[in-house]
Every structure is written in structure tokens, then in C-alpha cells.
């Protein structure tokens, strides 16, 4: 009986703690373009979006690490198991449609090297990596 009660309490606490992770990205009512992260239930990953600066909901984190801690970190190795050179390494760098200023890495097929570019925070293509190491792991090992 004590085990059942303990499991019920823990399950309720976990659901309450992470319930906001199921909320959609909400830019809020203001018009700033602040890069933030939300947990995307469709992909099971923390994804960047542009936050307006006020309003919104609790599925809104300043860093990807905060988002992953609250809602679950993806297995980075598994992210790249099905990587495709044509879509993940061949396209040119694409800044996307938002106005953020994030340093990212892309594979330049002309130079055969991973290089930096400025990512706006949303949109773009799959040739977009958080680190040089991540870019090289995917594109130089294919």
C-alpha cells in the first residue's frame, strides 16, 4: 500500500513538473526577437524559437541546457545515426527566417571543412550544427 501511494505521489509530481513541456512554443504578446528554447513534443527535442519578451508560457528556456534538464535531453549520438550527407552536409549555410544572432557550424562542400555562420534561430536547413565537433562527426565521417 505504501509503495502504491509513493508511486502515485511521485508520478503526480513528475507530471506537474514536466506538464509545461507539452505546451506549444508561444512567442508572447511583445515584439522583441529573443532567441529561446522550447521542448518540441513532435521531435522530442529542445528547439529554438523567437520570444517576444513578455507573455508566453512556461515552455520557454534561455538555454538549451535548461530546456533539456527540465524536459529531457536527446541522445546526441542517435540524432546522427540516420544522418544523410545530401541533406545534412551539402546544402549551403542558411540563416533561417528569424533575426537571432547565433554562431553555428555548417559543412562547406567546397572547402571540405566545417565553418561558422550566423543562424537566426528558426528555419534554415539540416546543415546547421551547434559545434565544430558535431559538424565534423556527421559530415567528415560519411
Swiss-Prot record:
GO cellular component: extracellular space
Residue ranges occupied by any BPTI/Kunitz inhibitor domain in the UniProt entry: 21-71, 89-139
Keywords linked to the UniProt accession: Blood coagulation cascade inhibiting toxin, Disulfide bond, Hemostasis impairing toxin, Platelet aggregation inhibiting toxin, Protease inhibitor, Pyrrolidone carboxylic acid, Repeat, Secreted, Serine protease inhibitor, Signal, Toxin
Cleaved signal peptide residues: 1-15
Keyword Repeat: yes
Tissue-specificity statement: Expressed in the midgut.
Disulfide bridge partners, by residue number: 21-71, 30-54, 46-67, 89-139, 98-122, 114-135
GO annotation terms (biological process): envenomation resulting in negative regulation of voltage-gated potassium channel activity in another organism
Pfam families in alphabetical order: Kunitz_BPTI (PF00014)
Subcellular location: Secreted
GO molecular function, a single term: serine-type endopeptidase inhibitor activity
Maturation and modification: The N-terminus is blocked.
Pyrrolidone carboxylic acid sites (modified residues): 16
Origin: domain of life: Eukaryota
Chief localisation class: secreted
PANTHER family (UniProt xref): BPTI_KUNITZ INHIBITOR DOMAIN-CONTAINING PROTEIN, KUNITZ-TYPE PROTEASE INHIBITOR-RELATED
Subunit structure: Interacts with host thrombin and trypsin.
Role description: Midgut thrombin inhibitor that plays a major role in keeping the midgut microenvironment at low hemostatic and inflammatory tonus. Also inhibits FXIa (F11), kallikrein (KLK1), neutrophil elastase (ELANE) and cathepsin G (CTSG), which play a role in the contact pathway of the coagulation cascade. Also abrogates platelet aggregation by cathepsin G and plasmin, and attenuates tissue factor (F3) pathway inhibitor cleavage by elastase. In vivo, inhibits thrombosis and promotes bleeding in mice.
Protein name per the record: Boophilin-H2
Organism name: Rhipicephalus microplus (Cattle tick)
